[in-house]
Amino acid sequence: MSVTMADQQPEKTTAPASDVADSQPAVVSNTDTRKETTETAEPQSEDKTATTTAQPAVETTATQSGTAETPAEADKAPAEVQQPPQAEEEKPVAQQPEQPAYLAKNPALSQFFERLPAIVSSSGHAEMWGVPLKDSNDAPTVNVLIKFLRANEGNVKLAEEQLTKALKWRKETNPSALAESTSYSATKFGGLGYLTTYKEANGAETVVTWNIYGGVKDINTTFGDMNEFVKWRVALMELAVKELKMAEATSVIDYDGEDPYQMIQVHDYQNVSFLRLNPAIKAATKKTIEVFTTAYPELLREKFFVNVPAIMGWMFAAMKVFLSKNTTRKFHPISNGANLAREFPSLKDQFPKVYGGSAPALQEGARTVSLIQDESAPAATEQSKEQANKEEAAQEESKPESAPEQPKADPDVIVQEAPAADAK
C-alpha cells in the first residue's frame, strides 16, 4: 500500500496547473498524513464549493421570492385595515344631518313634531283648518305646528296642550260642516258678517273678514241663543280660513318672518252705543273669544276697529296692560271708517266706497255664510214693534205735558268685552 502511494506522489507533484486550479489550493506537506488528508479533502472541497455555489442561488431565489411576496402581503394588509371601519354601512348616523333646515335650526319645532303622533292619538282627530296632519316633510302640517308654537312663544308643552284642545274641539264641533250649513237665520245674522278677498298686483291675496256690529236689529234675537251665535261666527271664520288655502302650501313659512297665511279683520261700530253692556252680548262675546283664542291662533295679521268714538281710546290703552305687545301691535282703532282704505294703498280701489275705496258696498259684492229667510221671525218682530209703539203712545198720553220725555234704551248696544281678542 505504501509503495502505491509512493508511486502516486510524484504524479501529484507534477500535476498540471489546470488541475490544481479546479480544486482548492493544495497544501504540500512532507508527511504522508497531510497528503492523505489533502487527497481525502479534495473531493469534499469540491462538494462544498458546489454546495456553496448552489446556496447563493437558492438564497437569491428565496430572497427574490421573499421580496416578491412582501408587496403582495403589503397589498393585503391595507385591505384588511380598511374593511373594519365600514363607514359607508353606518347609514343612520350619516342621515341625521339631512334633517330639514326648519327643524335643524328650531329644536322646539322638532320636539313638537315628536309629540304630534301622541297628540293626534289623544285627541282622536288629525285635521286642522282643512290640513290633514302628517309628518315634518309635509309643508301644510309644518305651517300649522309653527302657528301653534309661535302663539305660545316657543313653549312646546303649552303648544301641545293648545293643539290638543283645538283638535278635540274640531272633532266635537265639526266647524267645516258649520261653514257649509244653510240653517242660519237671516233675521238674526243677516248683514252682520262678510268676507272679501283682494288681489295684489303680484297675485298675492289678502283675505278680509268684516263684522258689522251696527247691523244688529235686535240684541236678544241675535245674541239670545249664545251657542247659535258662536256657531254662526265660527262658520264665517271657517270660510275665511278656507280662503287662506293652507292645505295647498308648498313651502314652509319662516318661523321668525312674515306669514302669508293670515287675514285682516275689520270691526265696524257705526251706530253702536257704548253706554251699557248687555248681558247677552257679554256672554256671547266671552264664549267667542274663548273659542277663537284656542282654535284659531296666529291667523290674524291686523285688526281694525272703525267708527269707534274717540272717547273709547281709553279701552285700547287699557288693553295694552293685559295683552302682549305682539298682540296689541296688531290693533288699529280708526274713528272715521272712510279712512280705512288708506291703510292699504295697493288695495284701496277694491275696498267699498264707505271705507274709502271705489268698490260697491259689502251687501252687494261680499260673501257670507248661507242664510235662510225666517218668515215667522219678521212677523213676530213687527208685532213686538207695533206693541211697543202702542205702549209708548199710551205712556205719552198719561204723562203730564210739563214732564220731560224719558230717554229710551238704545237697542243697538254692542260692546265687545275684549274686541281685540277675537283671533289671536
Curated annotation (Swiss-Prot):
Belongs to the SFH5 family. This is Phosphatidylinositol transfer protein sfh5. InterPro entries: CRAL-TRIO_dom, CRAL-TRIO_dom_sf, CRAL/TRIO_N_dom, CRAL/TRIO_N_dom_sf, Sfh5. GO terms for biological process: Golgi to plasma membrane protein transport; regulation of exocytosis. SUPFAM superfamilies: CRAL/TRIO domain (SSF52087), CRAL/TRIO N-terminal domain (SSF46938). Keywords: Cytoplasm, Endoplasmic reticulum, Heme, Iron, Lipid transport, Membrane, Metal-binding, Microsome, Transport. One of its GO terms (cellular component) is cortical endoplasmic reticulum. It is a peripheral membrane protein. Heme binds at Y213, R233, H267, Y269, K303. Residues 1-98, 372-424 are annotated as: Disordered. Residues 1-16, 50-68 have a biased composition (Polar residues). It comes from Aspergillus fumigatus (strain ATCC MYA-4609 / CBS 101355 / FGSC A1100 / Af293). Its cofactor is heme b. Non-classical phosphatidylinositol (PtdIns) transfer protein (PITP), which exhibits PtdIns-binding/transfer activity in the absence of detectable PtdCho-binding/transfer activity. Regulates PtdIns(4,5)P2 homeostasis at the plasma membrane. Heme-binding protein that may play a role in organic oxidant-induced stress responses. It is found in: Cytoplasm; Endoplasmic reticulum membrane; Microsome membrane. One of its GO terms (molecular function) is phosphatidylinositol transfer activity. The keyword Ubl conjugation does not apply. Coiled coil: none annotated. The gene is sfh5. SMART domains: SEC14. Pfam families: CRAL_TRIO, CRAL_TRIO_N. Residues 383-411 have a biased composition (Basic and acidic residues). Residues 188-363 form the CRAL-TRIO domain. It catalyses: a 1,2-diacyl-sn-glycero-3-phospho-(1D-myo-inositol)(in) = a 1,2-diacyl-sn-glycero-3-phospho-(1D-myo-inositol)(out).
